[in-house]
């Protein structure tokens, strides 16, 4: 699966960005739980999820800054 670029994420609506952020935070929680119970097989999903979450949070903060000015 190809990673979405920042320009792809900037085209999402505010509601979609917020929804994806919530989903990724939930996914990271579940991954940490699986890791603690030794049920996690794909450890690379941590990195992918954290990276996408950081990109989405960056897009969200850019929008907040541009709306404030």
UniProtKB/Swiss-Prot annotation:
<dbReference type="InterPro" id="IPR050063">
    <property type="entry name" value="Ribosomal_protein_uL29"/>
</dbReference>
<comment type="similarity">
    <text>Belongs to the universal ribosomal protein uL29 family.</text>
</comment>
<keyword id="KW-0687">Ribonucleoprotein</keyword>
<dbReference type="Pfam" id="PF00831">
    <property type="entry name" value="Ribosomal_L29"/>
</dbReference>
<dbReference type="GO" id="GO:0006412">
    <property type="term" value="P:translation"/>
</dbReference>
<protein>
    <recommendedName>
        <fullName>Large ribosomal subunit protein uL29</fullName>
    </recommendedName>
</protein>
<dbReference type="InterPro" id="IPR036049">
    <property type="entry name" value="Ribosomal_uL29_sf"/>
</dbReference>
<keyword id="KW-0689">Ribosomal protein</keyword>
<dbReference type="GO" id="GO:0022625">
    <property type="term" value="C:cytosolic large ribosomal subunit"/>
</dbReference>
<dbReference type="GO" id="GO:0003735">
    <property type="term" value="F:structural constituent of ribosome"/>
</dbReference>
<dbReference type="InterPro" id="IPR001854">
    <property type="entry name" value="Ribosomal_uL29"/>
</dbReference>
